[in-house]
């Protein structure tokens, strides 16, 4: 049955570049190198975001063609992922998993997450993955996508 599902499927690559603190290399530099080598039609970038209010924490998913600047929501901006920097259209997908809870008058940021953030991130990642698969493979049914995504 898998061969039948994959018949006629467009080629798609996946990459998890890691973060600078782990790899020693900017994520955008890794992605840029892969883009130059593989020449994709577009790049889909997924990242965590910072929420402006608690009611949005792990409850919304943002999709944009404007790109994304990792770390910008927590004051640690890294190199941008955008059409300008990568040379191909970029679809950026993100969900807010942290927020700044500093009190008025405090200078230092206080980043907080929900107590059950791990479970929420697992659910968000399943939803985002299903959405990306539905967009990339519009002929697939919900059941076919669910075979590959924990829905």
Task: Describe the function of each predicted region.
Residues 21:
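Metallocofactor- and cofactor-centric catalytic cores in central/energy metabolism, strongly enriched
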Residues 1-14:
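Glycine-rich phosphate/diphosphate-binding loop of Rossmann-like nucleotide-binding domains
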Residues 14, 24, 32, 80-82, ...:
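Non-transmembrane, aqueous-exposed alpha-helical and coiled segments at domain scale
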Residues 29-79:
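Glycine-rich phosphate-binding loop
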Residues 26-30, 38, 119-127:
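Conserved active-site and cofactor/substrate-binding residues in soluble primary-metabolism enzymes
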Residues 60-115:
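Glycine-rich phosphate/nucleotide-binding loop
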Residues 91-151:
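C-terminal functional extensions of proteins
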Residues 15-16, 45-47, 92-96:
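Short beta-strand segments
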